[in-house]
Structures are given as C-alpha cells and as structure tokens.
Design a protein with these regions (language model features):
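Extended alpha-helical targeting/anchoring segments
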Residues: 1-200
Length: 200
C-alpha cells in the first residue's frame, strides 16, 4: 500500500515538470503557516532540493526554470490537515523525447527528495549502511498514455509479509530519537490494523 505519494516528474506537451516538496507542518499548530515559511532548516532544505532537481533536469532537458518557489499547499489527509511547501520546476524536452523515455527516467533516479545532496555521495553512503533491498519503497510508478506522463515516488510504503505489516518512511539526518518520534507520528495515518507494525 502506498500513501501520500510525491510527484516525481510530469511530462506534458514536450515539457517536463517537477514539484520538489520539502517542509510539512500540522495545520493545527498555532501560526503554522508562518512557522513553516520562516523556519531556517525548512528553507535551507527546500533550497537544496530545488537546486538538486534543477541540476538533474538540466541533464535531460533545456531552458530549465523555477516557475513557482516555496508555494504553500494545504492538504487534507485521512485524519487531519497539513501544510507543505513545494516548488515548480519546468524544462523543455527534445522533440524525440518519447523514444528516450527510459533513459530520461533512469537519468533522474533516485529521486532527489529521497537521497538529498550531494546525490552521488549520499547514494554511496546509503548503499553501505542499509541492511537489505528496498523493493518498491522509494521507487517510482506512473502511467504513460503515448503522449503525456505522470509519475510519483513511493515515499511512504506499507507492505504485508505474512502476518507482519512493514512500514517504510524516510527522513533527513537528525537526532535518532526525534526521527523515531516522527516515524511513529506518521503511522497515525495508516489504515486500522490489529496486528504488529514494524517501522523500517
């Protein structure tokens, strides 16, 4: 089960779009919008991911432009409302992009929002410390109708193995206890399930 997927890339009329999302807060927090928009850590992380995605897109497209920067969205989840900040980045693909679609997607993987920056170094560290394969977690899925493409990243992922439910969700480098608290918080939005969850 995948929930709250994040857009990977969208291709429409020969243009490629990406919407990096960094920065989320519970809408019920007092002055939530202001806290999210002025938080130095959130601003820095957002700037970093926008720069990374611009760089990634420049490898497979031209005329890269950030058309919207750190805009605020209000999202209704199953149990509450949240605010998050995103940006919109656009590039122009070559006229024959359809014949190069596999190379375009592979050239953008892994998603910048998953690995962060610097990309090559971070991916190397992840490969060294992770204990096993991720499977579908943090991969992408989508559809291509012959003209346009929509795709998304599996950023929160629930997998059933036998009688066990394995929940996968990531986060940036932080203090381990705060990361674990955050991971536990996100499980509140999981479907009701009477068995044990394993947070991985």
């Amino acid at each position: 089960v995948i929930y709250s997927p994040e857009c990977f890339v969208k291709i429409k009329d020969g243009q490629i779009y990406s919407y990096p999302m960094k920065g989320t807060i519970d809408a019920q927090v007092p002055e939530a919008k202001k806290k999210l928009q002025t938080n130095p850590k959130e601003i820095n992380e957002h700037n970093t991911i926008v720069d990374l995605i611009r760089n990634d897109l420049s490898k497979i497209a031209r005329e890269i432009a950030v058309t919207r920067f750190r805009y605020l969205d209000k999202i209704q989840t199953q149990k509450k409302e949240i605010y998050h900040t995103s940006s919109e980045i656009i590039g122009k693909l070559s006229p024959d992009w359809k014949t190069q679609l596999p190379e375009i997607l592979l050239g953008l993987l892994p998603a910048g929002s998953i690995c962060g920056a610097p990309k090559a170094k971070t991916v190397s560290i992840i490969k060294n410390v992770e204990e096993g394969p991720r499977g579908y977690y943090t991969g992408i899925f989508g559809y291509f109708d012959g003209e346009n493409l929509e795709s998304a990243v599996n950023i929160r992922y629930l997998e059933k193995k036998g009688e066990q439910m394995i929940y996968r969700s990531g986060g940036g480098i932080s203090r381990p206890n705060l990361y674990f608290q955050g991971a536990n918080l996100t499980t509140k939005y999981l479907p009701d399930y009477s068995g044990p969850y394993h947070i991985g």
